[in-house]
């Protein structure tokens, strides 16, 4: 079970976007990276194709999982993630507040 999943609210811990929050769009477990909406935005030069014009486009680049942390559901501050067995399901728990991250 992954600690960070698609749709999670995360906080950037280091780098040029330190302190910013965003939603995880995509997780790449093999590369240990994630794409976060509005974070680590880069400009790329796009060649013209049949269905797209040429020009400079902005998009989110992947960020390493060690540089992001899940936002605590209670106060929005970064927290580590633990696991707990709730009935017959394994759920993620915020270490900071003890709240269940996913139902």
Curated annotation (Swiss-Prot):
Q: Which PANTHER family match?
A: MITOCHONDRIAL RIBOSOMAL PROTEIN L24
Taxonomic lineage from the root = Bacteria, Pseudomonadati, Pseudomonadota, Alphaproteobacteria, Hyphomicrobiales
Q: Which GO terms describe its cellular component?
A: ribonucleoprotein complex; ribosome
UniProt-recorded name of the protein: Large ribosomal subunit protein uL24
Q: Tell me the Gene Ontology biological-process terms attached to this UniProt entry.
A: translation
| Keyword field | Ribonucleoprotein, Ribosomal protein, RNA-binding, rRNA-binding
> InterPro entries from the xrefs?
KOW, Rib_uL2_dom2, Ribosomal_uL24, Ribosomal_uL24_CS, Ribosomal_uL24_KOW, Translation_prot_SH3-like_sf
- What's a Pfam family this protein contains? ribosomal_L24
Described purpose of this protein according to its UniProt entry = One of two assembly initiator proteins, it binds directly to the 5'-end of the 23S rRNA, where it nucleates assembly of the 50S subunit. One of the proteins that surrounds the polypeptide exit tunnel on the outside of the subunit.
Organism this protein belongs to:
Sinorhizobium medicae (strain WSM419) (Ensifer medicae)
Gene Ontology MF annotations: rRNA binding; structural constituent of ribosome
Q: Which domain of life is it from?
A: Bacteria
Q: How does it assemble?
A: Part of the 50S ribosomal subunit.
Family the UniProt entry places it in: Belongs to the universal ribosomal protein uL24 family.
Q: Which gene encodes it?
A: rplX
